[in-house]
């Protein structure tokens, strides 16, 4: 099965998405540049157009704001930070082309991206070949920090194994062991469903499911099949606009009365876009804005919200924030922007709480370069007393180490340049 996703997008839709990214003018890449000489150049590749655009826009918003704050405090190692944002258009070939452009023409010091796991995986091949420091803020497929891990690549979001491990036992305990999966047929969905099936089978469960194109919009045939199967739980593993459409049709078919709903991720960008009846189910959040026991979270939320239209930041804003500060911390520890020295500095580095914005110990694990971050398991619900973004109740927090298992079990064997 191919990771390549070919989508075409009307120019009007492209400009609408572009305008959402902080009102930046689009002339080639989006560029955020501080005054000063010899800037540190960071290339940021994300699918600003296509079915995952809402998630990408949040990541770019988070990156834009973080860079602005960094530059107000002197940049990195005294040099201003220049952010160059390119649209992968949710297409692997386009993403790879943009990576080559950023590295070979724009001479960036590091690369970040992509939301789409297949593109993130392909970018890793380019950055490894070119020996460029690379952080994946939000692409989840396991091989990135698993069997195909690279010395230069780190990941901030969870693996699919971590998300599946965190929520599977909760779904089985509350609802039952007969599941139906609706899953996107590309790198992310393939590894996610495999991990869910592994955990469910270990608990004595049974399942059926369909794997569909990431850009699917009509789920009627699959939902009819799911209804006939009569599962205890339907897992909607789609993402972006596809997940939104699936949720809407799930409610229209009245299936919310017949079975429980859940899965790995129902991100706030998507929860905002479905009717109240579909704002439901048990899921994981990779970060959430309401953490009363972590005062640094409130400080972050209060600071960034005015820059993103008064909304609460989502996990996607957090992923960019953490990734950029991780790069800063690595450069400061290494006292260099050399890719090898930065990678050596970040491996095993524990993030301070003002960067991690989490209650537990958070670090990029040395054995596989995967961020060990807390995972929030709970219920999505319609807006609560906390306002329009009060959409999730955390029922438990699973540590990254508990969800991920040992690094040597991932298949990662990092080979450093000689």
For each predicted feature, which ranges?
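Extracytosolic ligand-binding ectodomains
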Residues: 2-5, 9, 14-17, 26-30, ...
């Amino acid at each position: 099965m191919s990771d390549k996703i070919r989508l075409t997008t009307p120019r009007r839709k492209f400009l609408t998405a572009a305008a959402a990214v902080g009102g930046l003018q689009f002339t080639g890449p989006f560029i955020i540049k501080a005054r000063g000489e010899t800037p540190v150049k960071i290339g940021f590749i994300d699918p600003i157009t296509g079915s995952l655009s809402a998630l990408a826009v949040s990541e770019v918003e988070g990156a834009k704001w973080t860079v602005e704050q960094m530059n107000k405090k002197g940049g990195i190692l005294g040099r201003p930070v220049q952010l160059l944002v390119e649209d992968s258009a949710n297409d692997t070939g386009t993403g790879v082309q943009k990576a080559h452009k950023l590295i070979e023409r724009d001479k960036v010091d590091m690369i970040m991206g992509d939301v789409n796991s297949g593109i993130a995986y392909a970018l890793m091949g380019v950055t490894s070949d070119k020996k460029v420091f690379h952080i994946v803020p939000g692409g989840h497929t396991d091989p990135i920090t698993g069997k195909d891990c690279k010395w230069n690549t780190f990941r901030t979001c969870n693996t699919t194994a971590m998300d599946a491990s965190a929520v599977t036992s909760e779904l089985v305990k509350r609802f039952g062991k007969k599941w139906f999966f609706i899953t996107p047929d590309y790198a992310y969905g393939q590894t996610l469903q495999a991990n869910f099936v592994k955990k469910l089978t270990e608990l004595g469960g049974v399942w059926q499911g369909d794997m569909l194109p990431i850009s699917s919009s009509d789920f009627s045939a699959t939902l009819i099949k799911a209804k006939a199967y009569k599962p205890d739980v339907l897992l909607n593993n789609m993402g972006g606009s596809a997940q939104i459409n699936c949720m809407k049709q799930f409610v229209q078919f009245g299936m919310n009365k017949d079975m429980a709903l859940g899965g790995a991720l129902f991100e706030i960008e998507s929860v905002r876009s479905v009717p109240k009846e579909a704002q439901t189910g048990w899921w994981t959040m990779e970060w959430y804005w309401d953490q009363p026991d972590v005062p640094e979270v409130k400080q972050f939320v209060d600071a960034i919200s005015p820059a993103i239209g008064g909304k609460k930041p989502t996990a996607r804003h957090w992923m960019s924030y953490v990734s950029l500060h991780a790069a800063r911390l690595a450069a400061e520890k290494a006292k260099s922007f050399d890719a090898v020295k930065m990678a050596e500095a970040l491996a095993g580095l524990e993030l301070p709480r003002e960067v991690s914005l989490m209650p537990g110990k958070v670090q990029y694990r040395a054995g596989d370069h995967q961020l060990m971050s807390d995972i929030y398991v709970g219920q999505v619900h319609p807006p609560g007393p906390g306002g329009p973004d009060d959409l999730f109740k955390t029922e438990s927090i699973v540590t990254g180490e508990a969800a991920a298992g040992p690094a040597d079990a991932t298949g990662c064997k990092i080979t450093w340049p000689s």
